[in-house]
C-alpha cells in the first residue's frame, strides 16, 4: 500500500527564493591548483588510451579538488539540493577532451548512468536541428526551445557550460519539497494522483517488448524521506496519446497545479551559466526549467550554446519506491535508438 506523507517536509531542502538568492551559499570555486589536478588526471586518461567510465575515483585521485566536489555532494544531499562548481577547466579543449574532464569530476560525484537508448553517459545539450518537443522522438536536450519544469531520472543532474548563447537559456530551480508543502495547504485532494503517477513517453527509446510509454510517480515517501520525480510535461502529454487514450482532466489539473506553484516568482531562483560553470541539482528534492535560447547570428557550430550533461547516482544514496525510479539507474538499450 502506498504511504502518503500528510505533514509538511522540514529541513534545508525546503526553501524559497529569498533563502537561496545569495549564491555564495551554494557556489564552490576551483582554484588554479585544483584545476591543474583535474587537467592532469584527464590528460593521463587520454595518454593511456583509457575510457574514464572504466575507472573509479580511487584510480583517478583528486587530492584537493576531490574535497571540494565532496562539499558539493554534501550540499546536494543534505542542503538546498543545488550547487555550482565554478572554474571547471574547459578553455581551449575540444568537446571530447571536455567530456573527459567532466568525467573526472563525475567520478568524484558518484556513478554516471546511461541517459539514452544508446547508453551515452555524457550527452551534448545543444540545438541538434532535428525538430522540437512536439516531435514524437525529440528529447529536451536536443532542442533550443524552452523546457518546462522537470527533474531528471538519477540523483544528480550535472550541466557543464562550454559555450553560452547570446540570448536566453536561463536556468531556474525550485524546491520540490516546498512545492509539496504548498500542495498540502492548497490542494491536498490531489496528493493521491502524484503518488499514483502518470504515463510518460519513451520518445522512441523504449526497450524491446515494452510499450511506448511508462508510468512514473511524481512523489514517493519511503524510510522517512519524501522524494520527487517530475518529468517533462510534453512527455506526459504525448505518452497517453501513444497509448491510445486521453489524459484525464484531473491529471492535467494536478500537473498544472504543480507547475503553477513552481512558477511563482518567490518560489524559484534563476541563474545563467557561463563557460566553466557546472550546475548541479539534486533531482530528489528540486525541479528545474530552462528558457529558450538563440545562437550566434552566423549559425557557426563553434559559437553555438553547448553544454554537457551527466546523470549521477551518489554513493549510498537514498532509497525510494520503485514507482518513482524508472530510469534512476540509467536508461535501458532501446529496441531502435533514435538519437
Swiss-Prot record:
What does the record give as EC number? 1.14.11.-
Catalyzed reactions per annotation:
3-(N-acetyl-N-hydroxy)aminopropylphosphonate + 2-oxoglutarate + O2 = (R)-(3-(acetylhydroxyamino)-2-hydroxypropyl)phosphonate + succinate + CO2
Read off the InterPro entries from this record: AlphaKG_dependent_hydroxylases (IPR050411), TauD-like_sf (IPR042098), TauD/TfdA-like (IPR003819)
GO process annotations (BP): antibiotic biosynthetic process
> Which keywords are on file for this protein?
Antibiotic biosynthesis, Iron, Metal-binding, Monooxygenase, Oxidoreductase
How and how many cofactors are bound, per the record note? Binds 1 Fe(2+) ion per subunit.
Q: Which cofactor does it need?
A: Fe(2+)
Known role: Monooxygenase involved in the biosynthesis of the phosphonate antibiotic FR-33289, an antimalarial agent. Catalyzes the oxidative decarboxylation of the antibiotic FR-900098 (3-(N-acetyl-N-hydroxy)aminopropylphosphonate) to form FR-33289 ((R)-(3-(acetylhydroxyamino)-2-hydroxypropyl)phosphonate).
Q: What is this protein called?
A: FR-33289 synthase
- Species annotation: Streptomyces rubellomurinus (strain ATCC 31215)
Q: Which gene encodes it?
A: frbJ
Amino acid at each position: 500500500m502506498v504511504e502518503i506523507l500528510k505533514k509538511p517536509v522540514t529541513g534545508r531542502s525546503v526553501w524559497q527564493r529569498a533563502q537561496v538568492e545569495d549564491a555564495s551559499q551554494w557556489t564552490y570555486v576551483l582554484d588554479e591548483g585544483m584545476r591543474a589536478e583535474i587537467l592532469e588526471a584527464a590528460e593521463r586518461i587520454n595518454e593511456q588510451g583509457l575510457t574514464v567510465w572504466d575507472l573509479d575515483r580511487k584510480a583517478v585521485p583528486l587530492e584537493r579538488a576531490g574535497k571540494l566536489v565532496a562539499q558539493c555532494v554534501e550540499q546536494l544531499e543534505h542542503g538546498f539540493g543545488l550547487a555550482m562548481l565554478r572554474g571547471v577547466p574547459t578553455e581551449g579543449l575540444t568537446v571530447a577532451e571536455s567530456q573527459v574532464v567532466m568525467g573526472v569530476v563525475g567520478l568524484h560525484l558518484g556513478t554516471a548512468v546511461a541517459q539514452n537508448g544508446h547508453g551515452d553517459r555524457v550527452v551534448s545539450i545543444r540545438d541538434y536541428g532535428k525538430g522540437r518537443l512536439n516531435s514524437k522522438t525529440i528529447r529536451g536536450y536536443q532542442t533550443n526551445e524552452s523546457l518546462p519544469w522537470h527533474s531528471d531520472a538519477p540523483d544528480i543532474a550535472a550541466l557543464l557550460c562550454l559555450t553560452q548563447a547570446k540570448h536566453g537559456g536561463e536556468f531556474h530551480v525550485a524546491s520540490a519539497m516546498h512545492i509539496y508543502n504548498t500542495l498540502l495547504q492548497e490542494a491536498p485532494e490531489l496528493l493521491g494522483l502524484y503518488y499514483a503517477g502518470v504515463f510518460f513517453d519513451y520518445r522512441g527509446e523504449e526497450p524491446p517488448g515494452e510499450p511506448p510509454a511508462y508510468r512514473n510517480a511524481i512523489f514517493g515517501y519511503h524510510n522517512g524521506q519524501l522524494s520527487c520525480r517530475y518529468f517533462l510535461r510534453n512527455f506526459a502529454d504525448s505518452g497517453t496519446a501513444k497509448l491510445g487514450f486521453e489524459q484525464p482532466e484531473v491529471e492535467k489539473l494536478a500537473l498544472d497545479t504543480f507547475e503553477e506553484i513552481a512558477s511563482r516568482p518567490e518560489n524559484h531562483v534563476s541563474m545563467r551559466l557561463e563557460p566553466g560553470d557546472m550546475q548541479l541539482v539534486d533531482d530528489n528534492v528540486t525541479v528545474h526549467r530552462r528558457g529558450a535560447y538563440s545562437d550566434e547570428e552566423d549559425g557557426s557550430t563553434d559559437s553555438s550554446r553547448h553544454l554537457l550533461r551527466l546523470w549521477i547516482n551518489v554513493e549510498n544514496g537514498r532509497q525510494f519506491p520503485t514507482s518513482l525510479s524508472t530510469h534512476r539507474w540509467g536508461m535501458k538499450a532501446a529496441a531502435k535508438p533514435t538519437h
